[in-house]
Amino acid sequence: MSTAILVSLLRNGRCQVNRGALTLCFQKEHSCTTSTRHCFSANRRCFSSRFDLDGSGRPATWDSFGIWDNRIDEPIQLPPSIKYGKLIPHINLSKVGCSTQLGKRKENEDRFKLARLTPDILYFAVYDGHGGASAAEFCDRFMEDYIKEFLVEEHDMEKVLVKAFLEINKAFARHAHLSVDASLLTCGTTATVALLRDGIELVVASVGDSRALLCRRGKPFKLTIDHTPERKEEKLRIKKSGGFVTWNSLGQPNVNGRLAMTRSIGDLDLKSMGVIAEPETKRVKLQHTDDGFLVLTTDGINFIVNSQEICDIINQCHDPKEAAQVLTEQAIQYGTEDNSTAIVVPFGAWGKHKSSEVSFSFSRGFASSGRWD
C-alpha cells in the first residue's frame, strides 16, 4: 500500500480508518489486471492483497493482521502509519483485558491501572504490594500523575519513567514519615509500568518481580528481569550498602532476611541497605505483523506459570478479556497462594499465532513453576 493512500485519507480529515475503507482505497489505486498482486476469494469477506507490510521485503496479506481477520476488528491510525511507514492499528482500551484474583491471601495487595495519558500515549501498570497494600495503593493513585507531569517537559519515555519512579518513592517516604501508621515504613510494592506511544513505541520500566512480556510470533519476548538477590550485581549492591542476604526454607534469597526483591517502591527501612527505587527500562518498537499482545503479570502468576505457558494460555483465548481471566484462574488452579493479576493488551497479530489446544494440569510443584523459567 502506498503512502499516497494514507496521505489522501488524512487530507480528507480522517485520523483512523477501518479495514473496509482501506480495502476500498487499495482497490481504487490498483487495478485487478495484475493477478500476481491481487488474490480474490469468494468465501472471504474481503479480498487479500499482497504488499510489503513492514519494509522487510517479504510480501504480506491482509491475514498478516491478526486483529482484522481474527475476532478483534480495530481501525488503522493514519498519522502514525504515515510517520512510521507501516500500518498501525488503534489500541482500544475497552478491548484490553484485566483480571485480579485473591488467591489464598486474606487481602488483595495487587493493584492495576490503564489509562490514556495523552492522545498519543497509553499507560498500563501493575503493582504488587507487600507488608500491606498502602504502597501499591499510593502508586496506583499517583504514578499516572507524575508521568503526565514529566511528559510535558521530556519526550524520552524511558527518562520520564525513571524520574516518575524515583519521585513517587520520595513522595511515599514523605507520606509515611508524616503518618502515625508505623507499618508504612516497612511496606512496599513492585511496579511494572508500560507506556505505548502512537501504537508502536513501547517502553517498560520495572522494580521488583512483576513482569512484562511481549508475545512475538507465539514466543515470549521478555521485557523485564526480576530484581532478586540471586542477580550478582543486585546482591553486590546490597552488600556494599551494608545489607545482607539470607535464604528461607524454600531456598529463596531475601534482603536482610525479609524482602525477596532488591528494588521496590517503599520498603523505606531498607533503602539505606541498597534496596533502590530506580527502575530498569526496556524500549521496543512493535511489529504488528508478529506481535500478538503485551501482558503484565504479578508474581502470583509468574511464580507458577512460565513465560511460554503464559503465551500459550492467552493464545488459546478468544479475546483479551477472556485471556486475562483465564490466566489468573489458571494460576489459582495450579495452586498459587499469592494474589494474581494480569493485563493483556492486544496488538496487530492477535490470534495469528494461536496455540494448538493444550491440556493444562490443575496442580504442579516448584520445579515446573515460572520462578526459574
Curated annotation (Swiss-Prot):
Record note on cofactor: Binds 1 Mg(2+) or Mn(2+) ion per subunit.
Localization of this protein: Mitochondrion matrix
PROSITE patterns: PPM_1, PPM_2
Residue span, PPM-type phosphatase domain: 95-347
Cofactor dependence: Mg(2+); Mn(2+)
Any one GO molecular-function label of the UniProt entry: metal ion binding
Family, per entry: Belongs to the PP2C family.
Protein name according to UniProt: Protein phosphatase 1K, mitochondrial
Organism placement in taxonomy: Eukaryota, Metazoa, Chordata, Craniata, Vertebrata
